[in-house]
Every structure is written in C-alpha cells, then in structure tokens.
Amino acid sequence: RGFISGVNSFTLMAIPFFMISGSIMNQGGLSKRIIQFCSSLFSWLRGGVGIVCVAANMIFGAVSGSGTAAVAAIGFITAPDMEKIGYKKEFTGAASTAPIIPPSNVMIIFASITGLSITRMFLAGYTPGLAIGLILMVICHFYAKKHNIDYGGKFHLKAVISSLGECFWALLMPLIIIVGITAGFCTPTEAGAIACVYGLFVGVVCYKELNFAKIKKVLFSAAEGTGQVLSLYAASTVFAYIFTVEGFGVKFQEWLMNVSSGSAIVIELLIAAFVLLIGCFMEPVAVMPVILPLVFPL
C-alpha cells in the first residue's frame, strides 16, 4: 500500500510526460537535427565536439529532464566522435547537464516531497543549469588545448543558417516548455503534455520520421524510464516511512543540533557531507525521500 501511495501524486505526472517528449525527440529525428545545429555553431572552436555535446545536452535536457535519456539520445551520437579525435572515455561521459536544467526529474521529486512550487523550482534551476553548461564548455576548450585536439574546421554562416532551418521546429519544443512555464501559461505537467503533442506533430508531419513502429518504441522507452524512476522513488518512500515510525528523524535532528551547537553553517556543511557520502552509492531519486524529511525542516 505504501509503495503505491508513494507515487500517487499529481505532481509526479510531469515525469512520464517529459520522458515521452524526450523519447519523441530521439525517435522523431529532432535530437539529430539539434546536434547538427550545435555542430555548425561550435565545431570550429578548439574543443568544439565536446562543446557541441554539452550544448545539445542542455537543449535536450530542457525537454526530457532525464540524464539517462540525454545520454542515450545525445551521447550515443557524440561520444564515439569525441573518443575518435582524442577525448578520453571517462571525459566523454561527464557532459550531461540534463538533471540540472529544468524540467528535471530530480526537481519534480524534490517539489513533490517538500511541497514547494515546481514552477518556482524550475525558475530557480535555469540560471545554475546554464552556468554549469558554460563552465563545462570552457573545460572542454582547455582540455582540447592541453591534449592538442584538432579544430573541427572553419565557421560557415551558411551552414548555421541551413542547419537552423532544418532544426527550427525541433528548437521550438524546449522553447514551448520554458516559455509556457516561466510565463505562467501552464503548469509543468501541462507543459509536458503539450510538448508530447507538439513533438508528435513535428515528428509525423514536419520531419516525417515517426511511424507506428517508432511511436511504439517511444512509449516503451518512456514507460521503462518512468518505471525506473518511480519504482526507486516508491521504494524509498517506504524506507522513509520506517525511519519516521522508528523515530530516527527526531534523533538525527537532535544529533545535528548537538554537534553543530545550533550553527546554521555547520548544519548545512554536515548535511552536504552526509548527502555527498550517500550520493556516492545511491541515485538522487532514491536519496531524496529518505533525506529530505529529515533535513528540510531544519
């Protein structure tokens, strides 16, 4: 009963919608065109292939909200190219900003647990998400410079305009979500549903790459991703309930107050260290239902 009631939330309805829209981007040819556009913009720079990977991840993350989906869609295409020209394998796997940039599954679950507004969470996430993306681009540039990785060619304005025309409809998809949520036209859940319908229209009518077989793949892929996220979350809520019944939360809060002598900075540092330690072994989706009820009231 606790397993089912843990995911019985309207807020969490946003997750499958964003998963479906991300899967539509992948199967409908939208992600491929976004990579081509980013490539025309950045591939001429030192470290251009890495920068393209980061930029495409940021755009894809603004639709799917899932790091796994972003790696499957973008990393599958860009990672082999990065390795081929000299990037190390471990470096190529570190460019996903999808969990940070809204609509993030992590933010949706955080809001569901704490009762905070998802819209406000998303608005707060855009600036750090963009900042981290820009920092990763700079790192890619200096990494390529240090390891003497070649340039990707010259900048051609015609190629940028041509690729922009190709991916215009694809770029509108994240814009619909961002503008719809930030302007208050729709809730995040409604924005996800609108993105699904729009992506389906673009994939079938505009790019003509979505057929019945691919739509089946979209639904199965989204169901698999959603099932993984929500199963982890549901199991963690049961674990959190046991913690509450046994009074572990009160004991943990008392311990924090005693160790920190009531200092807010020390409490924050202890919580950060605790979350960092647990995050080395567990997914954020599994950590939050256990940790947030303990530390959020503080």
Where does each model-flagged region fall?
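Alpha-helical transmembrane segments of multi-pass membrane transport proteins
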Residues: R1-L298
